[in-house]
């Protein structure tokens, strides 16, 4: 379950940020997670909740912005949402796509009091 190690990293970032800014409470953490990252959001939230107990991040909300998997055909330039990991271009039929988005996994913002 890599979600637990991700939750651990998110918590570390939040606590370090709060300490650097003399924060007393982490209220909200904004995350950007791509469709292709393989992250199970419910598992990530559960792991974070367990790890944050007893810290200033206990009760903090995780606000997740999910980014769709998008590709661009290297032959014709068509950009599309890639569904079910089907990497064939619907316009020209070529099978070589450049990933445009969907692999993101980052902390976008932190709200600390």
Residue ranges and their predicted role:
Residues 1-59:
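Long, charged N-terminal interaction/targeting segments
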Residues 32-36, 65-69, 110:
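Short loop/turn motifs enriched for small/polar and acidic residues
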Residues 59-69, 90-91:
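Short, conserved loop-to-beta-strand elements that form functional interface hotspots
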Residues 67-68, 83-84, 102:
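Flanking scaffold residues of small Cys/His-coordinated metal-binding clusters
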Residues 71, 87, 105:
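Cys/His-enriched microdomains
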Residues 73-76, 89-92:
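Short cysteine-rich clusters marking metal-coordination/redox-active sites
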Residues 79-80, 96:
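Cys/His-rich microdomains that often coordinate metals
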Residues 91-113:
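Short microdomains enriched in Cys/His and/or Lys/Arg
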């Amino acid at each position: 379950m890599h979600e637990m190690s991700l939750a651990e990293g998110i918590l570390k970032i939040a606590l370090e940020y709060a300490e650097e800014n003399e924060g007393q409470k982490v209220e909200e953490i904004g995350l950007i997670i791509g469709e292709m990252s393989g992250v199970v959001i419910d598992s990530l939230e559960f792991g974070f909740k367990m790890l944050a107990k007893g810290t200033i991040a206990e009760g903090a909300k995780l606000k997740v912005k999910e980014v769709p998997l998008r590709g661009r055909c290297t032959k014709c330039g068509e950009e599309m949402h890639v569904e079910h990991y089907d990497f064939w271009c619907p316009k020209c039929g070529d099978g070589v796509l450049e990933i445009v988005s969907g692999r993101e996994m980052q902390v976008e913002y932190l709200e600390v009091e």
